Amino acid sequence: MKMTRRAMLAGLALPATAGMANTTYLIHPVAVEDGIWMIHGDDAPIHFSNGGAIANIAIIDTPVGTLLVDSGPSLRYGRTLKAVAEGLTGKPVIRVYVTHLHPDHGMGIAAFDPAIIAALPQAITDMARDGRGFSDALYRLLGDWMRGTELVLPGRKITEASEDFGGRRLRLMALAGHSAGDLALLDEQTGLLIGGDLLFHDRAPATPTADLPRWRTSLDSLAKLPHRAALPGHGPFDPTGQEAIAQTRDWIDWLEDALTAAVRSGLDMVEAGSVPIPARFAGMAAARYELQRSVSHFYPGLEAKWLPRVDMPEG
């Protein structure tokens, strides 16, 4: 299905932009493992005040060059990221991985040669289908932050199970659930799992393209990996390696149960977005916001499932 601008705006439910303001990205990498830095995105929704820089990004130093996992929301961010990363390592960026189609993770690839940008085939297909709608929406929401940003597609399809960079080896895992094509990476040198948006930590999971059963299957796969820490797509670094996995699963399980109960109780969409959120999620950023977004994503399907038309047989 082709994504229209109206559908894009409704699905993302992003807040309106503010007026003109300073549009300089301030990027502060923090070392989390040997030769790996994390850039912690804003845990808020996409907004003019943060320039759309809400996704976490990894910088990885290897003997042969610098690797990036995700690239931010705009050309301006991508250029700033490139300068910061190369300043840290003293080596050029030789690979940029895009974990999935969403624009907070992938529009920054406009700053790089497509030949060094890698993504799963499904993610590239999704970006080709929806990318212009994403770009149009972000231009309208973020204004000057997006100036010069054009849709760029990754030039390298990930089909191999790993990639080696001068002895630093990354395991590449093709998964799904947050989107139809979710890339997760395991740095074998340190045991760090980079989960993309399959993992949220102390930040409510976003669901605009989610398939919850497939997401659970992917989380099960990640939990079995020989990793010791996790860098989620959103939220703080997880030094345990398992907390982000468990927390993400807990939220999507509760979400599905809560919305199903709301439909079966006859609540409308506004009422469903106001149901109580369990106390265990009290410290989770953007919880009410993501609940309300998820209502718009899932409610029509749940209503069709649980409230069938009287003139149609069930089952």
Task: Label the predicted regions.
Residues 1-23:
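N-terminal export signals
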Residues 169-225:
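Active-site-proximal loop/helix segments of hydrolase catalytic cores
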Residues 214-271, 275:
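Divalent-metal (often Zn2+) His-rich catalytic cores of metallo-beta-lactamase-fold enzymes
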Residues 78-79, 83-161:
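Active-site HxH/HxHxD metal-binding segment of metal-dependent hydrolases
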